[in-house]
Design a protein with these regions (language model features):
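Short amphipathic alpha-helical segments
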Residues: 48, 74, 276, 280, ...
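Active-site beta-loop-alpha junctions enriched in small/polar residues
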Residues: 152, 181-183, 319, 345, ...
């Protein structure tokens, strides 16, 4: 099936008992066992079924199946946020003493997780420029458990050469984890370019309406975990915390996502509410239509800003003069979502005047909403970074980030025009 159809139908058919066509909300903590043996078999992973909503839930299962189908994966795990998804994806394969290699241009929360939080747990991150694959590859050693990148960077809007990075990682027997939040599977499917694990913040374009926080981890099911038992011992040796199960034996190609569910999620508990899963599923049904309008509007806004005398610079990979325009053509069909950034003449002071003058575009730090949104990253999402870190992340202090919505483009541009005029002071 095509993506547009999968987004509506994958993972669910009318309920056999009630004949309900919409996905039901299974708002329950627990699920009954047929008998003692059934309960034991569920806990031993011998049979499929529901145990407890911290680990699995039928509403969440539909979302997981649907997202796995859209990305082309073997399985998925829905969790409470995109940050939980990234954390659990890393913790599934890495432990104290290990490291991951990551591009430096990242969402501020992700950078903070990798640079400051995970090191306190003994997992180090080694950063290099997103466009220097050789430098990234050079950081991989025997304790590297994954390479990490964003398909489209937030907020910089940079495009990563996924195929080249995947090849570099695979030369060393290491998987590539790609955060595909900004691109969504409508614009880019990282597994088709060699990625092994995909994560999303479902809060953004997937949900699409700013109503629900959620995240997901998706497993391609193609990485040969069992071929390197020493590097990936967590997947290849008996786990004393879960009845001595060996995940590559119990789950086969889905070993990664199996361990992700029964270790990080089960033990740390960032479970997605079934109600949030239901709301995200509603948004997912219109994802393809919305992305078409998002990208169309973003290109119009980018052209408008580029021609405005009050604008110092514009970064949007959909513009022909962007240094990564060819990568945008290759990986997103020339439609690199609707996150763009620009600088206003007059620096941070003028930028603040611009933000304060907006009337239609909403001042907040989310992206991927049906509504157009604006923020000043250096004072919000990336506030915790020092000047050196801001430079590495591609976030100058005069940057304004726009997430272009699906309103009429004329109205978006009219609001930007009056705010730019106000920025003059």
């Amino acid at each position: 099936m095509k993506l547009e159809t999968l987004a509506i139908h994958a993972g669910f058919s009318p309920d056999p008992t009630t004949k309900a066509v919409a996905v039901p909300i299974y708002q329950t903590t627990s699920f009954a066992f047929d008998d003692t043996q059934h309960g034991a078999d569920l806990f031993d992973l011998k049979v499929a079924g529901n145990i407890y909503s911290r680990i699995m839930n039928p509403t969440n299962d539909v979302l997981e199946q649907r997202m796995a189908a859209l990305e082309g994966g073997v399985g998925a795990l829905a969790v409470a946020s995109g940050m939980a998804a990234i954390t659990y994806a890393i913790q599934t394969v890495a432990e104290a003493g290990d490291n991951i290699v990551s591009v430096a241009k990242l969402y501020g929360g992700t950078y903070n997780l990798l640079a400051h939080t995970l090191p306190r747990m003994g997992i180090q991150t080694r950063f290099a420029a997103h466009d220097d694959v050789a430098a990234l590859e050079g950081l991989i050693d025997a304790r590297t458990k994954a390479v990490f990148c964003e398909s489209i960077g937030n907020p910089a809007g940079n495009i990563v050469d996924i195929a080249a990075l995947a090849e570099a990682a695979h030369r060393h027997g290491v998987p590539l984890i790609v955060d595909n939040t900004v691109a969504t599977p409508v614009l880019c499917r990282p597994f088709e370019h060699g990625a092994d694990i995909v994560v999303h913040s479902l809060t953004k374009y997937i949900g699409g309406h700013g109503t629900s926080i959620g995240g997901i981890v998706i497993d391609a099911g193609t990485f040969p975990w069992a071929d390197n038992k020493e590097r990936f011992a967590l997947l290849n040796t008996p786990d004393p915390s879960y009845h001595g199960v060996t995940y590559t034996e119990a789950f086969g190609p889905a070993a990664f996502i199996g361990r992700c569910r029964v270790v990080p999620l089960r033990n740390m508990g960032a479970a997605l509410s079934p109600f949030n899963a239901f709301l995200i599923l509603q948004g997912l049904e219109t994802l393809a239509l919305r992305m078409e309008r998002h990208t169309e509007n973003a290109l119009k806004v980018a052209h408008y800003l580029q021609a405005h005398e009050q604008v110092a610079w514009v970064k949007y990979a959909g513009l022909p003069d962007h240094p990564e325009h060819q990568l945008a053509q290759r990986y997103t069909g020339g439609k690199p979502a609707s996150i763009l950034s620009f600088g206003i003449k007059g620096g941070q002071v003028a930028g603040a005047r611009f933000i304060d003058a907006l009337q239609l575009v909403v001042r907040l730090v989310n992206i991927g909403d049906a509504k157009s949104l604006a923020c000043h990253p250096a004072s919000t999402t990336h506030r915790q970074l020092n000047d050196e870190e801001l430079e590495k992340a591609g976030v100058p202090r005069d940057m304004v980030r726009l997430s272009i919505g699906i309103e009429h483009s004329d109205d978006i541009i009219a609001d930007l025009a009056q705010a730019l005029e106000a920025s003059r002071g």
